[in-house]
Amino acid sequence: MTLLLEEKYPIENCEPWDFCGFSYKVNFYNREDLTGIVVALDLTDHVLEKAIEEKANLIITHHPFIYNNNLEEEFANFPYKEKIYNKLVKLKISVYSLHTNFDADKQGTSYWVAKEFFPDEKPSPLGKYGALIKTKIELSELKAILRKKYSGPIMTNNKKASFSFNGVAFFAGSGDSPEINEHTTKNNIIITSDTKWSDWIFLSQNKKTLVNISHQTEELFIKVIYFLLTKKFKKGVNVSTFYYKNLINSL
């Protein structure tokens, strides 16, 4: 099953610093050994509870659960992971992630986020990870489009609501500022997430208009992988999903 995913999203496309693939793998894995699959953005205690409830022994996430070759260091930095990891071992549940190898696909994360907000448009590739919607649009119009499907916080460095742009550039997740700057123009509105103060300064100094939305929009990954798996395994393997509701709220 994971070989099927790697045919579409090759591990070779994973960044050198990334930890795509298995964070924990049970020694056996044939198709007949699968009791169920849960697809989520991240592995948390809630996702593990969902897997136990569904009697699933494979969890597929976008973000890798383990980001370190040294488990002791990983658990020291993120203590909550040790308890989850020990449960995975005890219950024989494998965890597999598709991260930058999924992002790098022509229809990767940025493509699907762009498609979510502009369903009638065809996103064009922008660098390795970005997607561009070519359209004339004002900042106020973009806000209205985002609000139709997104209720989280929206931040921008441009107060000119009526200023006209010729495209919307999506860099899903924590977009890399030098890459964003390289592949965009002053006439693009840039949409990304988790923008650091230094990135706001960098892009503002380069006269770029930035719009910051929640990283949680990457949950579109779940929909894509769920569709792929249920199309392939129409019978025999139960595929479930886990979405966070209101993980981050305004005070």
Swiss-Prot record:
This protein's UniProt keywords: Metal-binding
Cystine connections: none
GO molecular function: metal ion binding
Residues where a divalent metal cation 1 binds: H62, D103, E219
Record's keyword annotation contains Membrane: no
Keyword flag Ubl conjugation: no
Pfam families in the cross-refs: DUF34_NIF3 (PF01784)
Residues in coiled coil: none
Binding-site positions, a divalent metal cation 2: H63, H215, E219
GO cellular component: cytoplasm
Known partners and oligomeric status: Homohexamer.
The family this protein is said to belong to: Belongs to the GTP cyclohydrolase I type 2/NIF3 family.
Name of the protein in its database record: GTP cyclohydrolase 1 type 2 homolog
Organism: Mycoplasmopsis pulmonis (strain UAB CTIP) (Mycoplasma pulmonis)
